Amino acid sequence: MATKYSFVTIWRFDAPIDAVWDIIIHSERWPEWWKYVQSVVELEPGDENDLGSLQHITWTSALPYKLSFDSRVTRVEKPYLIEGVARGELNGTGCWQLSQEGSITIVRYDWNVSTSKSWMNLLAPVARPIFEWNHNILMDEGGRSLALLLHAHLLDIPRQKSGGMPRILVVLGAATSLALVTRMMYVIIKRGSR
């Protein structure tokens, strides 16, 4: 059974909204500045506003796994909103919302997805906090890198309820998850060789 996740990321930059928009809308360039975006491959072009575009995106992570999915842009309201759907190892919706308060641009990203990787779903009851921590690491790094690209300051990253997991818990959880996956693979391989 797929495990559902809902994430909210908020970035605040001392930069103009149009400059922030121009970087976010061009996801094909994300691998140039966002450490955890391994590749973005255009499958279908969109219109002049990128509406309808389809891309295959592969993410690396702070943990030893990758996730890939196709992402289609379903709604664009320049420079305020980009919505899309994901299909693949993650399935669901994502929404970038940009707003401006004085000289500050606020970026909110809502990511509501379920996982289709069986090992992730199997381990979710014990590893969910680790997966959530990993997501936050990816997004925090994205915010910092975007600020550098903008020559701006990332003013803060408000923390989600699952955000600041102590490092020891992450290490213990990752070790436990790795041991479980290793054991599962051993059993599967052993059964397959009979």
Located regions from the model:
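A short, polar/proline- and glycine-enriched secondary-structure boundary/capping micro-motif
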Residues: 67, 93-97, 117-123
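Signature tryptophan residues that serve as conserved aromatic anchors
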Residues: 21, 30-34, 59, 96, ...
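Acidic, low-complexity intrinsically disordered regions
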Residues: 7, 17, 26-30, 55, ...
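Hydrophobic ligand-binding cavity/cleft-lining segments
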Residues: 1-50, 176, 180-194
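Glycine-rich portal/gate segments that line the openings of hydrophobic small-molecule binding cavities
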Residues: 32, 41-93, 101-106, 141-156, ...
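Well-ordered beta-strand positions in beta-sheet-rich domains
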Residues: 8-12, 68-70, 93-95, 110
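Terminal "cap-and-tail" regions of soluble proteins that handle hydrophobic small molecules
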Residues: 2-3, 13, 101-194
